[in-house]
Amino acid sequence: MELKYKAKNVYKEGTDKEQINGFCEGYKSFLDSCRTERLCAEQAQKKLEAAGFTRYNGEKLKAGGKYYVIYRNKVTMAFIAGRQGIEKGINIIVSHVDSPRLDLKPHPLYEDSNICLLKTHYYGGVKKYQWTAIPLMLTGVIINGTGEKIDVTIGDSDEDPVFYISDLLPHLAADQMDRKLREGIKGEELNAFAGTIPAEGEEKELVKENILMLLNEKYDITEEDLMSAELTLVPALKARDSGFDRSLVAAYGQDDKVCAYTSMKALLDTEAPEKTALCIWADKEEIGSMGVTGMQADFFRNFLARLAEANDVNVYDVIDNSMCLSADVDAAFDPTYKDVYDVNNSAKLGCGIVLTKYTGARGKSGTSDAPAEMVGRIRKIFNDDNVIWQMGELGKVDKGGGGTVAQFIANRGIDTIDCGVAVISMHAPYEMVSKADVYMAYRGYKAFYKAK
C-alpha cells in the first residue's frame, strides 16, 4: 500500500498519445464551429439526431432509449434511459456553453469622425484590455419586425471580413499607461470598427448610412431590427495545437466548452447504462446562471417533474437518488504566476480530470461544498475505471475565488461536485488546456454515466 499520495501524469501512465491526439482533433473542430450557446445547441441537435436520439415529448421512457430536449434555442439536454427506473436516480453532468464575449448594445451603430463603430457591452468576467487589437467575429440572430429569425455570422470564413477594437499606440499612451490595469481599457472604449466608406449624398453620418444599406441589402433589415437582436463579438481565432510537442490546445471558449464537448461525447459513446444518464449544456453561467436559460431558472426542475410524471414516479425520489457532476473548469497551476496558487492544492496540466470539492471566495462563500461521501463515491468510480484524476482548488485562500452551477443543483437536493479540466488563462480570448486532461475528462464522464 502506497502511504503517500502522488499525482499521476497521464503520459507517464502509458496512455496512448495517438488516442489522445486523435480525440482532440474532434474537440478542436467543435471549438471552431460552436463559439456561442446558440451554435452549440444547433450542432448538438444535429449530432444527437445522427446518433439516433429523438426529441423528447413527454412519453414514458424505454430502457436504452435516447432522447433530447432543446430549450429556448440555447440549452441542450440529452439523455439515455437506464435499465433501472428514474426513481433510482439519474447520473447528471451539467456544463455550460456560454463564454466571456462582447455583446452589441441595443443601439450599436454610431459614427464619429467619418468612422462607423459598434458599441459593445462585455459579457462575463473579462480583462478588458485583452479584447483589443485581435480579430473578432460577429455572430448571433436578428428578429425582424415580422418575427422572422435571421442568422448572422461574419468573420468565421477566411473570406469574411473581421472586426477590430483599437488600442492606443505606445507613443501616445503615456496617460493610459498610468491607469490601473483594471481600467487600462474601459468598457466604453470597447468599440469595434464597422466601416469607413460613406454613402452618396450630403447628409450627416453617411458612413453609418452606408453600413445600414449593406445590412439591408444582405439581411433585409433596418436599424430598428437591431434592437431585437442578439449579436456578439467573439475571437475569430481557430483552435490550434500548442507547444513543440503539440500537447496543448489553444482556443477561445474552452471555459466551459471543454467540459461540454467531453461530457456529450461520453454520452454519445455510452450504451445501455444502469441508471439514466443525462447531459446538460446550460447557458448564462458566466453572469451568475440568471435568466430563463440559466441553471437558477426552473427549466431543470420542470424537466425532472415532467419526466417523473410521465413515468409514474415521485419526482422527490428522482432527486434524492440522483447525483451530479458540475462539469466546469478549474485554474491550472501556472509557474509564471505561482504566488496566487497553493501548489499542493492546485490542478496541474497533464495530471487528469480535476475534482473540486468547493469553490467560492472569502470563506467558501457561494459554494455547495460537496460532502465527503460524494467525493469518495466519485473517487471510487474513477479509480475503478482507471481514470487519472486530481484534486484542485481555485488559488490561495483570500486571493480571489469563483463559482459554478454546482451550488444551484445542490440547492435542489442533488449531491453535486465540480469536476472538469484545468485551464491556463481562463476567460482570456485564447485559453489553453492539456490534451491529456481533455481525454481524461471524456474517460471520467463516461465512467460516471455508467455508474450504478
For each predicted feature, which ranges?
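N-terminal hydrophobic/helix-forming segments and targeting peptides
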Residues: 1-452
